[in-house]
């Protein structure tokens, strides 16, 4: 398994990854393409694709922050889900990084329940520590005069 970093939205593979991102997450959890392009310009942000040989398997978007990595999105190609690729990806990511923050929502709907189940096999612990992460969406406020 290999991870390849992408820093240019014009890259064909980035486009493939972004398409997977769009079908894998609810719209409220996504940033727009423009906001994503802004994130790519930040050296702390990593957009990596996941490969098995020549086969595109998925993506991982994460931030290198003060002493830890914050996984923002992890998605596996729909045809490969349930095959163990996601677990292997997370295992490889954990091997190359020491402190990882993986945020999941409280398990109240199908998607959050599946996410909680996926991460339950890993040595992640629940914490009450508050961290500040870069926002997913750019907020623009209009002021009327």
Locations of regions flagged by a protein language model:
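Conserved acetyl-CoA-binding loop-helix of GNAT-fold acetyltransferases
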Residues: 76, 82-95
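Conserved beta-strand in the GNAT
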Residues: 49, 54-63, 68-75
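C-terminal "cap" of GNAT-fold acetyltransferases
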Residues: 132-145
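Short amphipathic alpha-helix that is part of the acyltransferase structural core
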Residues: 1-31, 35
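Active-site rim helix/loop that mediates acceptor-substrate recognition in acyltransferases
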Residues: 23-53
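Short strand-loop junctions, especially beta-strand C-caps/beta-turns
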Residues: 74, 79, 103-107
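Conserved GNAT acetyl-CoA-binding A-motif
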Residues: 96-110
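Conserved active-site alpha-helix within GNAT-family acetyltransferase domains
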Residues: 107-132
């Amino acid at each position: 398994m290999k991870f390849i970093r992408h820093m240019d939205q014009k890259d064909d593979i980035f486009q493939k990854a972004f398409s997977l991102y769009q079908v894998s997450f609810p719209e409220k959890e996504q940033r727009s393409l423009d906001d994503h392009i802004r994130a790519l310009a930040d050296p702390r942000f990593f957009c990596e694709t996941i490969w098995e040989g020549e086969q595109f398997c998925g993506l991982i978007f994460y931030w290198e922050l003060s002493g830890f990595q914050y996984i923002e999105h992890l998605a596996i190609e729909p045809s490969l889900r349930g095959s163990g690729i996601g677990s292997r990806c997370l295992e490889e990511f954990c091997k190359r990084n020491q402190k990882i923050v993986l945020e999941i929502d409280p398990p109240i709907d199908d998607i959050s329940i599946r996410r909680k189940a996926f991460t339950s096999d890993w040595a992640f612990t629940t914490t009450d520590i508050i961290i500040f992460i870069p926002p997913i969406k750019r907020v623009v406020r209009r002021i009327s005069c």
